């Protein structure tokens, strides 16, 4: 099992705050801001990264919706240290900082100690740091739906799944996909591969004869119609891709809701001893699934029913009987798993073929993210010349 220091001190907020402050909130919060200066910290210019561009799209949505109530500026790391860029943003008057990459956590923690009146948020999850709030989404909800679609659309019982990094929440997405596929195809088996390993994971799956593949989720609503190589797709005989269902992020919805919660006074209504992690699902609007218009009507209808059920809470992917790869019963089906149990999964369902890759095998560009957010981060030795987060 995963040993996460101070895990009990993490408060997972699984739903956005209410629309407005109550009487007690107004009393406890003598000063609720009327205007906020907001800084977005990027690892590179938006045109160089789809991930950064997606967050920049979210930044634009925030500005459009809140108008004169916010002043928003972007700060790009370039060749500078993250800490240096943060200090410049704070000196410029930033009240709120959105750090859009997990590699920024260490710099945010240091800055939060020096600037306790600035609100710091980092795009990560399951982090026990009280000075920096984390934000992310329950992607497993989307993967359950795309798994059901894949199970219905495969010509065989074998479906490929490309996971990005072995970090908190990834096994939950794999398992939810596997459970969804089993729901529509009882004999479905999921062949797991990893984008963090050398080589092309999609090509490896194709070489094994897999023709329905779940790739990583799409990072922005603006690209959901064009990036068919992401999401879940079928490879046709001529090599072209038939899109089936694509999970996608709407970061603008998340940024809008978080900033509105600050304006409503919700930010101060928590204990200072707890680390706050926002982990929202499809019901919040932060995540959704685009069902392809090319799906058969019945599969389209099923996908829509699953979307509605997950959003209203009547469908919970992990409220089912589950065995892991070693035959151990993980849930008897009488209850769902807690958010903490879901996030900390380090096992796979019995219809998944694959395992968590060793840290030593990862591509260098993935290593830092896994060192910070990885399932086995507590077992890693500190890097030479620096300490672990």
Where are the language model's segments positioned?
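A residue-level marker of the well-folded mature domains of exported/periplasmic proteins
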Residues: 3-389
């Amino acid at each position: 099992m995963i040993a996460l220091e101070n895990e009990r001190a993490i408060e997972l907020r699984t739903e956005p705050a209410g629309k407005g402050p109550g009487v007690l909130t107004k009393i406890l919060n003598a000063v609720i801001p009327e205007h906020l200066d907001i800084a977005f910290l990027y690892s590179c210019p938006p045109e160089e990264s789809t991930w950064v561009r997606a967050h920049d799209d979210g930044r634009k949505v925030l500005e459009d919706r809140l108008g004169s109530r916010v002043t928003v500026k972007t700060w790009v790391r370039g060749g500078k240290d993250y800490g240096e860029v943060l200090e410049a943003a704070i000196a410029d008057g930033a009240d709120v900082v959105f750090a859009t990459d997990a590699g920024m956590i260490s710099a945010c923690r240091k800055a939060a100690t020096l600037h306790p009146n600035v609100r710091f948020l980092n795009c990560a999850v399951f982090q026990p740091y009280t000075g920096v709030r984390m934000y992310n989404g329950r992607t497993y909800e989307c993967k359950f739906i795309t798994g059901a679609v894949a199970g219905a659309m495969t010509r065989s019982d074998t479906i490929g799944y490309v996971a990005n990094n072995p970090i908190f929440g990834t096994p939950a997405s794999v398992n939810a996909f596997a459970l969804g596929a089993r729901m529509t195809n009882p004999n479905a088996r999921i062949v797991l591969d990893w984008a963090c390993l050398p080589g092309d994971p999609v090509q490896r799956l194709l070489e094994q004869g897999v023709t329905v593949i779940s790739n990583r989720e799409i990072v922005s609503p603006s690209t959901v119609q064009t990036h068919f190589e992401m999401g879940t797709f079928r490879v046709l005989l001529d090599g072209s891709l038939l899109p089936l269902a694509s999970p996608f992020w709407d970061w603008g919805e998340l940024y809008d809701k978080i900033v509105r919660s600050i304006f409503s006074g919700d930010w101060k209504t928590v204990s200072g001893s707890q680390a706050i992690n926002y982990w929202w699902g499809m019901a919040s609007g932060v995540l959704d699934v685009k069902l392809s218009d090319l799906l058969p009507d019945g599969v389209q209808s099923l996908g829509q029913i699953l979307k509605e059920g997950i959003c209203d809470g009547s469908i919970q992917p992990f409220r089912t009987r589950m065995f892991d790869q070693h035959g151990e019963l993980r849930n008897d089906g009488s209850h769902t798993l807690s958010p903490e149990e879901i996030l900390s999964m380090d096992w796979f369902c019995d219809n998944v073929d694959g395992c968590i890759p060793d840290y030593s095998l990862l591509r260098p560009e993935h290593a830092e993210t896994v060192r910070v957010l990885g399932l086995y981060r507590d077992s890693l030795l500190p890097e030479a010349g620096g300490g672990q987060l």
